């Protein structure tokens, strides 16, 4: 594997670990030229369902996009990166378990809201307000009252 620092083609694996959930392998590598270390991850190459938007367009599922939307909702909230990664893993697991080639974006949004509700109620309200396109304060009030119960 090519070194990300100096582009040298020879690197050596110095440590290998299986993730806690057993779904990926983490490898620490060291460059033979510059001696710098870096981490790589190996995961099975699985096909996630295409996401069908409200307007009928089909787009590829993107982990980075999911992570970015959750991170935005969780901005300045006391939730660790590990907790967010765990939530994303659970969402992806559910996507794969659906066993379908296409999934409505609404279903993905519901999965995200369910995970955010477990992680942080404020982040849940933030995400839901954008996802459900709240137009007035009463919609916020209804959701906040629901979360408080």
From Swiss-Prot:
Record keywords: ATP-binding, DNA-binding, Metal-binding, Nucleotide-binding, Repressor, Transcription, Transcription regulation, Zinc, Zinc-finger
Stretches assigned to the ATP-cone domain: 49-139
Molecular function terms from GO: ATP binding; DNA binding; zinc ion binding
GO biological process entries: negative regulation of DNA-templated transcription
Cofactor list: Zn(2+)
A Pfam match: Zn_ribbon_NrdR
DNA-binding keyword on record: yes
NCBIfam families from the UniProt entry: transcriptional regulator NrdR
Family as reported in the entry's similarity comment: Belongs to the NrdR family.
Described function: Negatively regulates transcription of bacterial ribonucleotide reductase nrd genes and operons by binding to NrdR-boxes.
Protein name: Transcriptional repressor NrdR
Annotated organism of origin: Albidiferax ferrireducens (strain ATCC BAA-621 / DSM 15236 / T118)
Organism ancestry: Bacteria, Pseudomonadati, Pseudomonadota, Betaproteobacteria, Burkholderiales
